[in-house]
């Protein structure tokens, strides 16, 4: 297992070591010990899974403290463009976004720390996404940023006029008006 740092501090791509042969493959998607050896000490408490059709866009979501979540995101089937936006007001990369292609084929994962908004778009026919969280869902602390905020200039890999977006996500504020407490 190895970690690929991004230009945003604390936001990392995790690449597992895959063992393959004529039968298929095996890999550890998460090991508390190996993560700790890599300097990542997180106690995950909840796993979430979603299934989405091509053109679906989910996000950008976050939870405010004290229920802020770190997420470890991976794709079980299909392909997504996974996006994280830095909401930490004291960070030199505040308001900057990072995106990465996650797929069942490349087996990469994105570790999204507390203080970030997270979302993804589905670019394959369907996608199953699983993510581990270090805090439970708390409706009262949820927040979000509109996916098409022009100041973020995110390339979702699709025509946004055709995107399948929930009503809830369509009415989220731009980053300048979000209720982030980070």
What spans do the regions from the language model cover?
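Non-catalytic, conserved peripheral segments adjacent to functional cores
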Residues: 1-105, 126, 133, 138-182
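Conserved metal-binding segment of the jelly-roll/cupin
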Residues: 102-125
């Amino acid at each position: 297992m190895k970690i690929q740092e991004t230009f945003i501090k604390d936001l990392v791509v995790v690449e597992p070591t895959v063992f393959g042969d004529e039968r298929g493959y095996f890999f550890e998607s998460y090991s508390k010990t190996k993560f700790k050896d890599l300097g990542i000490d997180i106690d995950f408490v909840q796993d979430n899974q979603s299934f989405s059709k091509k053109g679906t866009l989910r996000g950008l979501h976050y939870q405010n403290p004290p229920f802020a979540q770190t997420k470890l995101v991976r794709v079980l089937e299909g392909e997504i463009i996974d996006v994280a936006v830095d909401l930490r007001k004291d960070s030199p990369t505040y308001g900057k976004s990072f995106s990465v292609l996650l797929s069942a084929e490349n087996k990469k994962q994105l570790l999204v720390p507390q203080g970030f908004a997270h979302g993804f778009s589905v670019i394959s026919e369907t996608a199953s996404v699983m993510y581990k969280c270090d805090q439970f869902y708390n409706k009262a602390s949820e927040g979000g940023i509109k996916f098409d905020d022009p100041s973020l200039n995110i390339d979702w890999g699709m025509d946004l006029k055709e995107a399948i977006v929930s009503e809830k996500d369509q009415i989220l504020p731009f980053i300048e008006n979000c209720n982030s407490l980070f």
